[in-house]
Amino acid sequence: MENGQGTGSKLGLPPLTPEQQEALQKAKKYAMEQSIKSVLVKQTIAHQQQQLTNLQMAAVTMGFGDPLSSLQSVAAQRQRALAIMCRVYVGSIYYELGEDTIRQAFAPFGPIKSIDMSWDSVTMKHKGFAFVEYEVPEAAQLALEQMNSVMLGGRNIKVGRPGSIGQAQPIIEQLAEEARAYNRIYVASIHPDLSDDDIKSVFEAFGKIKSCMLAREPTTGKHKGFGFIEYEKPQSSLDAVSSMNLFDLGGQYLRVGKAVTPPMPLLTPTTPGGLPPAAAVAAAAATAKITAQEAVAGTVLSSLASPAHILSQQMGLPQAVLAAQAPGIITGLSTTKTVFHLVGLVNPVLASPPVTAPASMGTPTSAVQLHTEVKREEDSRRTAEDHSAPVGNGQDSELERLSVSASAGRQAAIQSKSTVMVLRNMVGPEDIDDDLEGEVMEECGKYGAVNRVIIYQERQGEEDDAEIIVKIFVEFSDAGEMNKAIQALNNRWFAGRKVVAELYDQDRFNSSDLTA
């Protein structure tokens, strides 16, 4: 059985060729790795459920409120902080430079998800600044460190954090503190032809490596040009960053920096008594091995009558080899790398292998169920918050009208779901410049996450000398944050003007009707 011929001789099948035996071994290795990943996910879910049970018991014992809402709130805050950490503000951009130039300049630090450049509808030119969003926070951190004051198009560009980072600063600091417990570094601008082993062999010069993993596309299996390396000693990671940043490897200059987030940033720190990572991986490997041994007999017998088995006989390849070479599957992975760090903004509870593991070890449905329940609870909580949030300054009079008029009640319900604030009488046409939008976003970012800012000039007549009124629309990600901004900014004085901050109808805003 060890040489891959025992089963064939018993069933009257021809012996495997050396190439087929090699492919079969690769398939077995890959199946074992996927099984270990699946078991690790199950362990994570079980550990989280145990933490939740402990929180609930503590809440009942001590008379606290619902712990589930608190746990969800922490997860949502960490998710929002990670999203903010992935964005950088780029200012002082020369007006002739376009999005392609910005992308080319900032792409070496990591994959870019989006570039948001604000355009002037009159001049059809951008307003001199942009927001670049990366897939991982480490890419944004490197861009922030290495691109500020760099000459681009004859100007020294300004690179900084978005204005909305202020509110998330405590959580960002907490993530950074958790990241310091791991000796991880981030490596970007990796040549497409280099493999995990190539990178590991280069960086091993600075110390013993615990794990080296490049982020890969789930469909093609090709790496995305970045990855994470974890050393055993802190000094090794420091030496690697100082020596390998801007190192020419394969014709591309590497970008190397310290990791600013833990391996699984959406998880709160493990409580004392939890299983250490190494022990968890070892336990997962043992569990996967036992499960695989139990499934061997049933899998072999059932495969004899399957269509895949018939196809394998026609092609001269065993079924296991066909499975190993199916589209979207990565073969030839090393089983010695049993530490699986998830990179980017991926919920570790939902992180599943790129392909389905063997039938007896499929993707755990409990993870999907848990996510669905948590999502439903979060939506219910947000809906309740939205309906209870104050609506502008005339809340008392609005409540009176609600009791009298059903139509007014429906209107109030629609408005309570709006996340758009309009600022009136804040500036005049002569005060509009390239920095105004960024300044408004930074100021409003103190009250919550700002999706976008629109500066609208409304002419009050068809005459050439008709008065122009400037309205500034600010869209938040949450209605509660928008209401905080209204309460803080309404009737506030700015440059000799008394600002009026009001809620704006969401449907009008979505349909680009800014005239109300």
Curated annotation (Swiss-Prot):
GO terms for molecular function: DNA binding; RNA binding. Residues 372-388 have a biased composition (Basic and acidic residues). Disruption phenotype: Morpholino-mediated knockdown of the gene results in embryos with reduced body length, microcephaly, retrognathia and heart edema. Its main location: nucleus. It is found in: Nucleus. One of its GO terms (biological process) is mRNA splice site recognition. InterPro entries: Nucleotide-bd_a/b_plait_sf, PUF60-like, PUF60_regulator, PUF60_RRM1, PUF60_RRM2, PUF60_RRM3, RBD_domain_sf, RRM_dom. Keywords: Apoptosis, DNA-binding, mRNA processing, mRNA splicing, Nucleus, Repeat, Repressor, Ribonucleoprotein, RNA-binding, Transcription, Transcription regulation. Belongs to the RRM half pint family. This is Poly(U)-binding-splicing factor PUF60-B. The lineage of its organism: Eukaryota, Metazoa, Chordata, Craniata, Vertebrata. The gene is puf60b.
